[in-house]
């Protein structure tokens, strides 16, 4: 039996987190609360379409595979970047056509390729000769998109050590190999790194892609597909506007031909700001100095790095705690340290911050928790993952 679709609560104008907290009665809930604003996702899509009208977004499912998010983006016409059979299956379940999916994993198990073939998901990336031979054997009529390496000088999560071939030598060799095997090379792909903060990174990569298109033409390929990857910020619209301006300029310079289909793989851009995590303090410990004066307060929350805060370890995120006290200005602010609930000393959320002297049962909120959080969360030590509530503007 299929799982029931979660309830969506509707709001007018702006989502009031404090009101949500009051109505949920979190004192009775052991789990942390993940508040997901689906309208934030839709607003980001509209912003993308406004600032990057030629580039179709293919949402990176790995970033947040919540079915409610995927369903919304499917309904709004977005494409999808999938890395596995299960991600492809999830997306197809929302009546997304195969043309709206790119299998953007250059190293796929054979069973995943066979699933893609069965469901006519033909666009996929390659960055090594073994994958080319694998496709020749298991999916010879697929569309090969050569992924090359072109990293940003500043990125939250660089990817070049694992994926992407050398753009100057290896990419051409893969195209020659594909030609000899009578496979179709339809385009190129790159990823400057997740959380890119260097404006020039995209222009460098797009220029390399243009050179490969020229080489492909010499081989007789009519390449018409460019994937500029991800890396777009999720919580800084000003920075995104600057990146969009740089990308538009580069695309117009190197790919003025409108027949070339250009896509991107934004993940955190769509979902980072959509989620606010609210945690409850279930324990507290005070540390005093040699003179007996209160020096540091340690708080223990009902979520940690084995849950939503895995983003600290795996995504290099810096999370910012905010309290919901009305009289905080009148309270002393003390050096504070925040721990997760598990028995592991690695389960540290934040340190060297100053908070008012909070008590057991008080709440702390963390914004921008929609990217690379819940998909990786586990119930380590028996602590439940957060409960998610969904909201949407009327």
Swiss-Prot record:
Chain positions recorded as pyridoxal 5'-phosphate binding sites: 194, 231, 265-268, 372
Family from the record: Belongs to the Orn/Lys/Arg decarboxylase class-II family.
Site, as annotated: Stacks against the aromatic ring of pyridoxal phosphate and stabilizes reaction intermediates: 191
Pathway in which this enzyme or protein is active: Amine and polyamine biosynthesis; putrescine biosynthesis via L-ornithine pathway; putrescine from L-ornithine: step 1/1
A Gene Ontology BP annotation from the UniProt entry: putrescine biosynthetic process from arginine, via ornithine
Pfam families, sorted: Orn_Arg_deC_N, Orn_DAP_Arg_deC
Regulation: Inhibited by antizyme (AZ) in response to polyamine levels. AZ inhibits the assembly of the functional homodimer by binding to ODC monomers and targeting them for ubiquitin-independent proteolytic destruction by the 26S proteasome.
Subunit structure of this chain's protein: Homodimer. Only the dimer is catalytically active, as the active sites are constructed of residues from both monomers.
Keywords, in A-Z order: Decarboxylase, Lyase, Polyamine biosynthesis, Pyridoxal phosphate
Molecular function GO labels: ornithine decarboxylase activity
Main EC class the enzyme belongs to: lyase
PTM annotation (N6-(pyridoxal phosphate)lysine): residues: 62
Requisite cofactors: pyridoxal 5'-phosphate
Superkingdom of origin organism: Eukaryota
A Gene Ontology term for the protein's cellular component: cytoplasm
Annotated SUPFAM superfamilies: Alanine racemase C-terminal domain-like, PLP-binding barrel
Protein's name in the database: Ornithine decarboxylase 1
InterPro entries on file: Ala_racemase/Decarboxylase_C, De-COase2_C, De-COase2_CS, De-COase2_N, De-COase2_pyr-phos_BS, Orn/DAP/Arg_de-COase, Orn_de-COase, PLP-binding_barrel
Function: Catalyzes the first and rate-limiting step of polyamine biosynthesis that converts ornithine into putrescine, which is the precursor for the polyamines, spermidine and spermine. Polyamines are essential for cell proliferation and are implicated in cellular processes, ranging from DNA replication to apoptosis.
Residues annotated for substrate binding in this entry: 314-315, 344
Organism of origin: Drosophila melanogaster
Organism taxonomic ancestry: Eukaryota, Metazoa, Ecdysozoa, Arthropoda, Hexapoda
